[in-house]
């Protein structure tokens, strides 16, 4: 149990302040175009402020046609950069490592959500 509070250093040079990591949870709080919402920003920042050594976003789709669920965070457009940059800065300001889980739903992308036949 004592190791949980010890730092963890990765070969790449990053170091977690402790060994607590926020798993990528699907919270469906982003806007329909994948832009980070204030609610999702606040939720993730609160996790970092709470002491996680690593804070990971929900699954963020890398292509519009790869969206898997409504309210999914996007990382495929310049329109997403402002919110993602703000989020990374906020997470880091609490001493937590910011990680974005990337995702493509492929054939499981709902046609009614992406507007066309999914890739598969």
Predicted regions and their residues:
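Flavin-dependent oxidoreductase catalytic cores
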Residues: 1-120
């Amino acid at each position: 149990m004592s190791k949980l509070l010890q730092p963890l250093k990765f070969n790449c040079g990053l170091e977690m302040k402790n060994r607590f990591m926020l798993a990528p949870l699907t919270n469906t709080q982003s806007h329909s175009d994948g832009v980070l919402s204030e609610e999702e920003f606040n939720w993730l920042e609160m996790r970092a402020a709470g002491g996680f050594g690593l804070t990971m976003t929900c699954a963020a789709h890398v292509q519009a046609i790869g969206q898997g669920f409504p309210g999914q965070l996007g990382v495929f457009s310049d329109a997403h950069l402002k919110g993602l940059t703000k989020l990374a800065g906020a997470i880091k300001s609490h001493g937590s490592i910011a990680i974005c889980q990337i995702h493509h739903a492929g054939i499981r992308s709902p046609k009614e959500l992406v507007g066309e036949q999914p890739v598969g």
